[in-house]
Amino acid sequence: MKAVYLDYLLRIRYTYVFNLKVSYQSERRTYGATEHFVGCLVPKAWNCLADDYTDIKTLLDLLFGVTAVIIFACTFKCFTMTEDGLTKLNLEAFLGVSGNTQELLESLGISAIPDLSNLGASNNNNSGLTFDPNDPSAAAFYIAQQVAAIEHPPPRKMTSSEKTRSENRERKKRWREQNEERNKDNDLRCRVNKKAKKLFGSEPSIEKTNWIEAEFTRRHTKRKEKERACLSQNQSSNASRANSQSLLPDLDLLATNSSANAVLQGSAINNALNALAKDPNLIHSLLTQIDFDPSKSKDGLNLGSLTDVVPPQPPQPEHELAALQEHNEAHDAAMRQYELERQQNAMLPGLASIDGLQALPHLDFSDSAVTNQSHSQSQNSLHPLISQSETHSIFSALSETPTPVSGNGNVADAPPDFSLSQVMPLDLIAPSMQPSAVSSPMSESHVQISSEMPRTGMSALPMRPRSQNVDKHRKFPYYNKRNAVTTPSSPYDGAQSGSPQFPPFELPPHNYSQAQSPNLATPSPSFSSLPDVSLPPIVKPNLMSEPTPTNSDEKSHALGFPPPPGQKIEFQRSSSKNGTAKSD
């Protein structure tokens, strides 16, 4: 049987069995067999092997004999731990009524009692036992004490270094509690110095020092105010809780006992007012506790019970209600009128003088259908004025003065000195006009209101043509005034000079929204302020032939003026010998 159990244990738990046997044999020579086995090895075997009692008993029987089995059984089955940590034996329940040791052995499956004299008679100083080895109860009590010492070991004596560290830890804890404000100030100053180093650099300066002190004072004051606010809030909450507890009985007395005498009611009111005066936040806390449902029972403080104490407010007079209603209606009407005027001004800017739009102020622009209809009417009323014949022109239709009507009912033409700017700015009329529908007393070649603007977005006015007789005194800035013979007077004077011609300069844009340019193809009568001048033909320059520069050109170039376009002049310092040398 032993061989079978040994083979089983070696195959299943070979590692732990080997370690346990080696540790037992090594420790037995030093401390003694029984004491060390009970104190150290038995808990290891119980916790690490298995829950099956048979395996543990067999292992102990194979390794140490029957004595170990008895000690093991007495240790883990014969005692219980109490609350105070002391060991109390329960041998009576385990051994039976007679208390015979033979019953213990029979229950453990042991047929003979081993010789325990060696356990108590050992002369080993390290394993001195204080119990009788022949008494199983004494042996079990001793084993229980050893197990209790293992589970609850006595405090270990600290070394000098451990004691010093523990004392320092406690001392620092007390110092932090006593110097809490000082630590906060030091931490705040470190943060301020770090911020100042980023702003002013690491070098000391007066500005840096002043900023550090001001910032530290500001942050310190802010922290103190925050701490005071938190402290007052905590105190007020505690006071509110205490005062509410003392105020509720008085209010409940006033609400439930309406027939109480005046003395009782007066004392309750005084107590309630005193409590409210001590804590302003008490009303808010009371509102959270009051039940405003009058349908509930009057078992506590509710709205139904307070109606007996606080009388209802009298209703407002009828004339005051009527005046308030009239005021509200007048205010609403004024707001509607203001919105109507604002929408009219936003939709129809500058067209209030047109006859077709006189009825628009009587419309309600809050309706989208009315808005669309009025806008279409304004456009329709404007287009017939533009598309009329020459006898009924746009100038007479837009005039502020009464338009004269002839005998046959037709509208007379406008006077010759009529100005469009007197009626309306051109920017407001030009987007609505069609180029083909514009008719005026004057020629269409000189007044063309066209929607086809240049791609650059710049408008150009009709430019007066340059005349040789008028512009004879004018010179371009890059010509010398003393070269009047060889210098052309204008870019249009191409017949008298071989210099290249230039297109007319564009004038800067003006405040007119449409371009007006003279029609050069068909001569027609023009405005009175613009004389009818015929333009000479523009001669294209011959790019293949280079003009020969003269001495005057060299002189003007030497004086700092640039040469005429198309000419490149190079001269030498010794002009006496090589004065006529020209560069190709």
Curated annotation (Swiss-Prot):
It holds the Pfam family DUF3020. Residues 159-188 have a biased composition (Basic and acidic residues). GO terms for cellular component: cytosol; nucleus. It comes from the Eukaryota. Residues 151-188, 222-243, 399-418, 433-584 are annotated as: Disordered. Residues 399-409, 433-453, 483-500, 511-531, 572-584 have a biased composition (Polar residues). Residues 231-243 have a biased composition (Low complexity). This is Uncharacterized protein C17D1.01. It comes from Schizosaccharomyces pombe (strain 972 / ATCC 24843).
